[in-house]
Amino acid sequence: MTITVDIEIEDEAWTTAEADAEALVWRAAQAVLDAHEDIEGQGIVILLTDDDSVQALNRDFRKKDYATNVLSFPSPPNPEGQIGDIALAYGVCAREAAEQGKPLAHHLQHLVAHGVLHLLGYDHERDDEAEAMEALEREILAGLDVPDPYASDEEGR
């Protein structure tokens, strides 16, 4: 089954910083979907937006009044087969990439993969869940030539 990935760019800062942001997002989302051929559903919407918009979503839906890098909103079962929506905040993502010394393109692809995995039911609340999700992220990102995003985290443990 083909799953549509619709990408909406609300904040042009994304394409100013990464001219091929839309293609990067699509490739990362598609890599996750390709690794899960048994998915039931029709579509995912990914919104590249600003910090204020993500803060409003986080406040309204999670009761947390701050911007975060990525939010995932799995859809309840629906006749359209929508899997869910993802929103990414440019300012937070760009700041994190700079602080972590990695290209924004790599961080963007990591967060898209992370968000899509959440839509598919993966979580990281417990250590065993986090390890499984991170392992899958590493595998997917390696296929996109994105270095292990958790490598520096583990060196510090």
UniProtKB/Swiss-Prot annotation:
Q: Which GO terms describe its molecular function?
A: metalloendopeptidase activity; RNA endonuclease activity; zinc ion binding
The main enzyme category here is hydrolase
PANTHER family for this protein = ENDORIBONUCLEASE YBEY, CHLOROPLASTIC
Q: What is its main location?
A: cytoplasm
The record's section on InterPro entries has: MetalPrtase_cat_dom_sf_prd (IPR023091), YbeY (IPR002036), YbeY_CS (IPR020549)
Q: Which GO terms fall under biological process for this protein?
A: rRNA processing
Q: Which GO terms describe its cellular component?
A: cytoplasm
Role played: Single strand-specific metallo-endoribonuclease involved in late-stage 70S ribosome quality control and in maturation of the 3' terminus of the 16S rRNA.
Q: Per UniProt, what is the name of the gene that codes for the protein in this document?
A: ybeY
Question: Per UniProt, which keywords does this protein have?
Answer: Cytoplasm, Endonuclease, Hydrolase, Metal-binding, Nuclease, Ribosome biogenesis, rRNA processing, Zinc
UniProt-annotated location(s): Cytoplasm
User: What protein family is recorded?
Assistant: Belongs to the endoribonuclease YbeY family.
Record's Gene3D superfamilies?
A: Metalloproteases ('zincins'), catalytic domain
Positions contributing to Zn(2+) binding: H114, H118, H124
What cofactor does this protein call for?
Zn(2+)
Note on how the cofactor is bound: Binds 1 zinc ion.
**Any idea what this protein is called?**
Endoribonuclease YbeY
